[in-house]
Amino acid sequence: MEKLKNELQAELTQNIMPFWLNKMVDHRHGGFLGRIDGHGNPVPDAEKGAVLNARILWAFAAAYRVLGKPEYLEAATRAKDYFMAHFIDPQEGGVFWNLDAQGRPLDTKKQTYALGFAIYGLSEYARATGDEVALQQAKDLYADIERYAFDSLNNGYVEALTRNWQPIADMRLSDKDENGSRTMNTHLHILEPYTNLYRVWRTPQLAERIANLIDIFLTRLLNPQTNHLDLFFDDRWQGRRNIQSFGHDIEAVWLLHEAALELNDPNVLQRVEHAIKAIAKAADEGLQADGSMVYERWTDTGKMDTQRQWWVMCECVIGHIDLYQHFGDTAALDIARRCWHYTRKHIVDHEQGEWFWGCDENARPNLVDDKAGFWKCPYHNARMCLEVMERGPHPQPLSKGRGE
């Protein structure tokens, strides 16, 4: 475990963060560039996405909190200032979905997922620095989500709304998604920032919202027949249940566990720990003999998407490290190590820095998709490094063993 921690600290400090510090700062228009293509070429006129910028903020704030490097604080503050000046909607509240390169709003819809990541970044900045303005903005965005996006009739959070919080026809997060009004992905990335906000703002209402989100996962999103998390639903939680996303499954394992541990409610923790062991076992259906984890499977056709995407590798490492740390699962530690070794060999770009989007089943790197961009951010890989760095070298069981 110590060797893994040292390797990941070196990866973070010598490869990932220097790339974003040295190549992604937008010296002309402020903030950060919107895109570097798969070959490493900057695209100076690229749009700037809310998710990318919130994740940059989170990554540098978290890295500063853990390592205390002044250059990380400077970058985090740059990201925070730009986000609050340009992405926050001063008239209607919430967060713009994207901006042009000059910082002017393009798509003004309110995607709940983007508000979640804004809370994640701002709350981490407040956690790292004690900044009250960032914390207040995070609280305001939390209030926006609860006021406009929460459906008290059917429970759960709507996927997207117009700028002034009215229903919108196309709610999709990306063109790869189904147009469902409820998605597992958005609920996961509301649970995640709410947990982080709770670390710096411990209110009973927020605790209740986190507990409710956990319940949604265990009663609505978890498929009791497969133990995978289903992805797309309508307002009444009806869905096709035809896609199994191994990366989201293993990411949810540790984020659900983190939320339950932070709440510190024994009953909630017991329910979560029972569920995440089953979800982790289902996620491991995506593991390959080479140590990697593939992307997803369509159950109606049996087809497997065998891409090895960067973010899936990261979540595979964290999820299995969590199983090792809390349940003493040495097999999970071995899975995490092997996944990192595959990633280091085939997905880390040792020449130009950062990571490729991924590679195919023959380990050929994906040069078509971005090196940095709307969805390719220093979030999954920086967080993988930080999560392993912050965890102890030996198992620290906080609860009953995995075999219960």
What positions do the PLM features span?
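Glycan-recognition and catalytic cores of secretory/periplasmic carbohydrate-active enzymes
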Residues: 1-393
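Intrinsic disorder/low-complexity segments
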Residues: 392-404
